[in-house]
Amino acid sequence: MPLFRKIHIKNFHMYAVILLVFIFQYINSDYGNKVNDFPYLQNSTIETSDIGNAMSRNAVNGYDVRSENVSKWLMRFRLYSIEADEMLNIMALGRIKPSKLEFDPHYYAYGGAYLYPLGAWYAMLKKIGVIKVGDLKWMIDHSDEMENIYHYGRVFVLFSFVLSALLMFYTLKSFSSPKFSFLATTIYLIMPINIMFSIIMKPYVYSLLWVNLSLFILSIAWSKKKLTTGLSLAMGVSLGMAVGSVIINGLFAVIVWLIIVYFSIHSKINISKVFIIPIVAILVFFITNPYIFINYDAYVEELSRQSDWFFIGRQPKFVMDFVSNSVIPGFGIAFTALMLYALLSSIFTSSHVINKIVSYSIVAIIVFISLISASISEWHINARYVLYFIPIIFILFSFSLNRNKIRVLKVVLFVTLIQSAPLFIAYIDEDSYEHSTRIKSAEWINNQNMLV
């Protein structure tokens, strides 16, 4: 620790840490593919007529699902990844055919502000020969190419994540010292929930790119003490992309809107510039998610199917379940303690009214998310719905009266690193013939069928 005090944090220190995390996660991102190496799975014949109609029904995640059969399960080994729902990205993109001007993904849980950029990423990789794609039969017969597609889809999310970290670093520098910003961003990079979801093809961590861009723009307006038309337009686009990727991020947009309205009331900001933001945000949301309106029937069918999973909780226990089962495992026990301190400090000791408003908003969101996710309250990954808490809490903490902020962040970093360490090992074990229960199961299936 004494050595760290002598280091004058420069930007390149942050760049080095971000690059190190990127390299490590890039190596880890190609995981969960060795099941297809077994002869039975490699050589089995799959009847495409028996594998269902997900590529033709109106809602990919609808009710029109055919019964299970051997061909369908073998197809899943060839075309699905180890991560639940990653294949829905591929199904949705497979329904989009630009040459025929067909852009409806027929899957809407992952927003268009995420799916369309992911599709553009794949189109670029295909053009330069990094990935190969074909029709359904070709993909089934070339499962190694499917593995490549999943790998580079995860890399797309990883790129977004490290860029979001860079934005967070520069945002925090507007409110605090370079050392504070460096420590906070490093914690952000190694947090368990971010380690997990930065190499999974889902929109939650990807949306942090737009969340942190919104906060970065806000920090520019705060430091300049004015909101220009350009900043308003940029803020509207970034919020629209954040919500257009993950609709629950609308709660984050409300927090940002409250901050902007508060400052507009207490400054000489032109009110028209303030209202540009929601207008542009809504416009961007509609542009990136047009088919929830154009193909409303499919959207309703998907929502109906998803509603079968959920019920609204009404008991305080669900709040405790959310914190104990998702927030602490996801954010880390040390950051959770820091979050509690930052919220209480802002509510009871801060002289900044806006800090109190933001803190009360976060508490309200915790209760709201806890109750609407009551049916899955035992899951450990629900913190993905509130990832925007992380940068907000660090900003609140930077305003606290605590004189030992750097020391506190060092402790949080150390404890978070210890808590995240098993995750790094888990990715190694996932492809280990000695430790992976999934691979051992595949080996057993292979051996049993080879005896027949």
Give names to the regions the model predicted.
Residues T416-V452:
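Membrane-embedded, lumen/periplasm-facing catalytic core of multi-pass transferases
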Residues F197-S198, Y204-L208, A242, L251, ...:
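Hydrophobic/aromatic-rich transmembrane helices and adjacent perimembrane loops
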Residues M1, H8-L19, V237, V254-L258, ...:
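Signature aromatic-anchored transmembrane alpha helix within multi-pass, membrane-resident enzymes
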Residues S143-E147, H151-F175, L213-I217, A342-S345:
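Transmembrane-helix motifs of polytopic, lipid-linked glycan transferases
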Residues V21, A184-L189, F216, L239, ...:
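Short helix- or helix-capping micro-motifs
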Residues Y15, V130-I140, M168-I190, T229, ...:
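Transmembrane-helix signature of polytopic, membrane-embedded enzymes
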Residues K173-S174, P178-K179, S214-S232, A242, ...:
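Membrane-interface transmembrane helices that cradle and orient dolichyl/undecaprenyl
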Residues N43-V65, N89, P117, M241, ...:
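Transmembrane-lumen/periplasm boundary regions of multi-pass, lipid-linked membrane glycan transferases
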